[in-house]
């Protein structure tokens, strides 16, 4: 019985080292994401909070919510484009139509990445796939 328990114990140890996880994120990525979120919070406070409010809930029918936003989380490139170039026209967020205009904010690519990382990881949003400056630079106006 003792031998069986030892074999099972060592088998579990070996098995635990061979498994992989689709959710694994290298520690360096975690550190970069954490730093980006920290920087993004400052940018959000300066540039975005007056319309989208401190809690990211926006103003009903005027400014769309960022908190628990289906648009933000499902339309990553369009969200980056909106911050980078501004947006006009109709968008639907959480089933509600918004027709207001958001002007271009004049942020640099790294600042856009930081604010996107902040808003996609705050107020009930979770995005472990860090948005990079290179990703922002690759987003065109059209």
Feature map (PLM): residue ranges:
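A short alpha-helix capping/helix-coil boundary motif
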Residues: 25-26, 48, 57-59, 94-96
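Bacterial Sec-dependent N-terminal signal peptides
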Residues: 1-24, 31
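Active-site catalytic pocket residues across diverse enzymes, especially alpha/beta-hydrolases
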Residues: 70
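Sequence/structural segment immediately N-terminal to covalent heme-attachment motifs in c-type
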Residues: 33-59, 73-85
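Short alpha-helical patches at coil-to-helix transitions and adjacent helical residues
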Residues: 3, 37, 109-112
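Axial heme c-ligation environment in periplasmic c-type cytochrome domains
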Residues: 60-67, 88-142
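Electrostatic cytochrome c docking/interface patches
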Residues: 20-43, 138-139
């Amino acid at each position: 019985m003792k031998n069986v328990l030892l074999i099972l114990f060592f088998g579990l140890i070996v098995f635990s080292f061979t498994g992989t996880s689709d959710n694994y994120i290298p520690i360096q990525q975690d550190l970069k994401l954490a730093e980006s979120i920290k920087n993004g919070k400052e940018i959000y406070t300066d540039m975005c909070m007056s319309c989208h409010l401190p809690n990211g809930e926006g103003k009903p029918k005027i400014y769309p919510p960022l908190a628990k936003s289906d648009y933000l989380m499902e339309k990553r490139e369009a969200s980056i484009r909106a911050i980078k170039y501004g947006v006009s026209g109709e968008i639907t967020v959480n089933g509600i139509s918004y027709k207001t205009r958001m002007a271009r904010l004049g942020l640099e690519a790294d600042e856009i990445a930081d604010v996107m990382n902040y808003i996609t990881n705050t107020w009930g949003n979770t995005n472990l796939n860090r948005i990079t400056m290179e990703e922002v630079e690759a987003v065109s106006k059209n």
